[in-house]
């Protein structure tokens, strides 16, 4: 993806998350100088298999850390500092060099224990399917102009005032939500946590937008890494069954602190089929026995929660929509090998809604939940793909499947993944 005219590349999920962005970022990061996360928080789970039996799950630290790239957590991320350092220490213990490789935006908002208490209490009532990591409540504080940011820790007296006020308000809300006294937040525990973490967090704090801008000015390659997927975007996803941030490419410039004209290319990551976690519509969801087969073959369990993912067939309506709202310039198709044993593979090419054929995504979740998918069935290849390293290595039926996804999606396929390891990748020239 990187070249004379593609210095800054965004990687986004083009379905409901869990598309394999971690692997694709890991592959691209080999040629990147800087990798930046631009939204989400500890609810993300990017799995990277580096080979030789080594696999890493990254929640807040950009996947580029495994390739030795300098990594930045942008202002659009809501940062759980306790989990950040647990993740950092785990990487160091496994031999990954992290010293002077990680920076954090001083404008990033902090996810604190009271956010998690609120998240879990609300989930008991609303059943949206959150991870319980406090992401939504942190973004609420951010947009309500009452959050605590990394840079606030430079003035601990001011930070203490902010935290005490927020804990008091959180406990009032928890009481309204029916939480007992044992489920209330403790302000003094919050303050002790921040006082313990501040000396370690503040040396990482930078003006992330300036770091990225200066890297681009030096001619360096910059990779902007998204979390979740386009259909979970708070504006463009299957609302209200969405996350609380802008997961689409438009969120990258805002979540990093650069202008949109600095972005040269946007790569959308899609599975060769479709999955989602939790509640909400999934038009091409397979019947239970087939979904279970895909789930077992693809290891479709959440990297953050362990929850089984709902599984279905490739949905071209979803991907075309993602191409449009992200301005995708290319696609990376992952987990093609999961379909190795299927004799026939249905592909969703359109929807019927109230007897009419439609080829675009309805805005309201009730209508999306009522659509009937229109399928075309293509032949499977029934051969293992794990050793393929060029398109020419794929069986004709597998190559035809990739070509069909490209035609239906409306963007060129740039990468095809045929296994979990970083070397099991086909780059399409």
Where are these regions (language model features)?
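Non-transmembrane, aqueous-exposed alpha-helical and coiled segments at domain scale
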Residues: 1-429
């Amino acid at each position: 993806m990187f070249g004379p005219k593609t210095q800054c590349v965004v990687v986004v999920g083009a379905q409901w998350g869990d598309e394999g962005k971690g692997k694709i970022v890991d592959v691209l990061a080999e040629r990147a100088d800087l990798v930046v996360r631009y939204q989400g928080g500890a609810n993300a789970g990017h799995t990277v298999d580096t080979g030789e039996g080594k696999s890493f799950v990254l929640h807040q630290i950009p996947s580029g850390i495994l390739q030795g790239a300098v990594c930045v957590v942008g202002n659009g991320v809501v940062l759980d500092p306790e989990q950040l350092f647990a993740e950092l220490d785990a990487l160091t213990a496994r031999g990954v060099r992290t010293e002077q490789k990680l920076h954090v935006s001083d404008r990033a908002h902090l996810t604190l224990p009271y956010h998690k208490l609120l998240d879990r209490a609300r989930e008991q009532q609303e059943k949206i399917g959150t991870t319980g990591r406090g992401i939504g409540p942190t973004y609420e504080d951010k947009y309500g102009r009452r959050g605590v940011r990394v840079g606030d820790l430079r003035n601990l007296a001011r930070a203490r005032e902010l935290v005490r006020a927020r804990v008091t308000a959180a406990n009032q809300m928890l009481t309204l939500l029916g939480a007992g006294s044992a489920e209330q937040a403790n302000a003094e525990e919050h303050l002790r946590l921040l006082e313990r973490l501040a000396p370690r967090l503040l040396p990482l704090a930078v003006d992330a937008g300036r770091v990225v801008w200066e890297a681009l000015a030096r001619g360096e390659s910059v990779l902007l890494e998204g979390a979740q997927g386009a259909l979970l975007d708070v504006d463009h996803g299957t609302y209200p069954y969405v996350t609380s941030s802008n997961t689409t490419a438009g969120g990258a410039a805002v979540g990093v602190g650069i202008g949109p004209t600095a972005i040269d290319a946007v790569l959308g990551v899609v599975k060769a089929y479709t999955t989602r976690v939790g509640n909400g519509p999934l038009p091409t969801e397979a019947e239970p026995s087939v979904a279970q087969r895909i789930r077992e073959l693809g290891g479709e369990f959440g990297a953050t929660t362990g929850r089984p993912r709902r599984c279905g067939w490739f949905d071209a309506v979803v991907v075309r929509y993602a191409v449009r709202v992200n301005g995708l310039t290319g696609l990376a198709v992952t987990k093609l090998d999961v379909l190795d044993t299927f004799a026939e593979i249905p592909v969703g090419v359109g929807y019927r809604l109230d007897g009419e054929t439609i080829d675009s995504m309805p805005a309201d979740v009730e209508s999306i939940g009522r659509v009937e998918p229109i399928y075309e069935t293509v032949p499977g290849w029934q051969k293992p793909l794990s050793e393929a390293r060029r398109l020419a290595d794929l069986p004709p039926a597998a190559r035809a499947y990739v070509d069909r996804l490209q035609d239906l999606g409306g963007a060129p396929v740039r990468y095809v993944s045929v296994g979990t390891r970083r070397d099991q990748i086909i780059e399409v020239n």
